[in-house]
């Protein structure tokens, strides 16, 4: 019995004052962080060498890998430090099949696995092209354009030309990038008040609201004359500048400045400062009145000389389409017209002018800045209650859906007109924003949009009307994310900059290749030509068509 080990009774913790463990715990045991998701097989690492070479650390816990969780039993205050909250990238646990591709959904492996048959491509069978990617001609979708941009290799940047050549004697005053302009805001600008109204408007023909792709109408050419007067050439603005206002402009110029953050092409506006008055004008022989086409598209039209699909040719075509469309949808002839208070100042006997009505409106922008702007309407409409509704009529044009990489209108316009409009908002964001701002400034009740397409893509002279659509300008501006507070803020910022300068002529130009605008101090005779009576081909085009 004496050779046996004595039995020692173990000490049991007994809580006399409650239920559960004792309150006095062992404070000498350091805390070791742990993870409940650690694999149980980790204990086998103690008895045998690891056999995993590729994933040797798959059983390693993600806790305790950093010194921020280490335990130091010291009383030295120098070891006290704050916890790093910048983020800790822990160990990624082992995942089986992590680097394998998705075989089921990978089109490259369908030919090997036998799932998903090969379909016909261009000239024969091509594996890897799904059945849903066929076109109606039996050709597979061409993915060469997408394959050329893999791994972040974007298309080469196109260097655009500026709208005007910057001369060496011009002084740069200010350079403002678009992110700064997008932060500007001028809220609580009240609706403009009418000062003078002149001209006459024809009534809208409601039969054009029933046009669809199957019931298209040809676009007719009109011989009616339209005058594109600048700010300083307008006789009404000259008369008003003597009594009221200190900022004078037209709705096209204001819309260009207000929507400058959406533009990609270069443009310019002239600021003439005389005393405390500023005239916002456009240069003579400039292409300011031409409408851009696919300006904000991912692949804008190529600048090929002599091509009908070059940016300049498309701009001329779009301008002619808008001029003809806004007159064709009106009931002309001997029908009654809506007459404004004053006749058109340039109205002549025997000259057939277009249906257009001008409103010269006044806005108070604060800080003693009174804006006088000429706005316009294209037609009127008899409302359901007999009221008169003013219209702004514009037209979108389709030139070549395959070349522009957009939806084909004749297939989608009747069934998916919302998708067509979304595509146009993406490709022509700046142009649609300008039209919306012009409609809001003039106070139009409706914005009529027409969809005009070529008869065949290779003929840029014959067009057909496929559909019309109408919007309320205020609601449409909300849909396209157009903030009028930001638009007024951009205009007010540029006016304040020019107001601080001495009297003279200044040029605001959109940089052709960078998202910014530049303000230059130019000489008084910077844009004077040898013969001011000569008109450019673009202005003759606008006046004669």
Curated annotation (Swiss-Prot):
What compartments host this protein?
Cytoplasm
Compositionally biased, Gly residues: which spans? 114-127
Where are the residues of the annotated region Disordered?
99-158
InterPro entries per the UniProt record, alphabetical: eIF3d (IPR007783)
Whether Cell inner membrane counts among this entry's keywords is no
Q: List where Basic and acidic residues composition bias occurs.
A: 133-145
Please verify whether the record's keywords include Protein biosynthesis: yes
Q: One MF term in GO for this entry?
A: translation initiation factor activity
Question: Which Gene Ontology terms describe the biological processes this protein takes part in?
Answer: cap-dependent translational initiation; formation of cytoplasmic translation initiation complex; regulation of translational initiation
Q: Where is this region: RNA gate?
A: 287-301
Task: List, as start-end ranges, the regions of compositional bias called Basic residues.
Answer: 99-113
> Record's Gene Ontology CC terms?
eukaryotic 43S preinitiation complex; eukaryotic 48S preinitiation complex; eukaryotic translation initiation factor 3 complex
Give the Pfam families listed for this entry. Answer: eIF-3_zeta
Keywords per UniProt:
Cytoplasm, Initiation factor, Protein biosynthesis, RNA-binding
The family classification in the record reads: Belongs to the eIF-3 subunit D family.
Provide the assembly information.
Answer: Component of the eukaryotic translation initiation factor 3 (eIF-3) complex. The eIF-3 complex interacts with pix.
Q: What is known of its domains?
A: The RNA gate region regulates mRNA cap recognition to prevent promiscuous mRNA-binding before assembly of eif3d into the full eukaryotic translation initiation factor 3 (eIF-3) complex.
Physiological role: mRNA cap-binding component of the eukaryotic translation initiation factor 3 (eIF-3) complex, which is involved in protein synthesis of a specialized repertoire of mRNAs and, together with other initiation factors, stimulates binding of mRNA and methionyl-tRNAi to the 40S ribosome. The eIF-3 complex specifically targets and initiates translation of a subset of mRNAs involved in cell proliferation. In the eIF-3 complex, eif3d specifically recognizes and binds the 7-methylguanosine cap of a subset of mRNAs.
Q: What is this protein called?
A: Eukaryotic translation initiation factor 3 subunit D-2
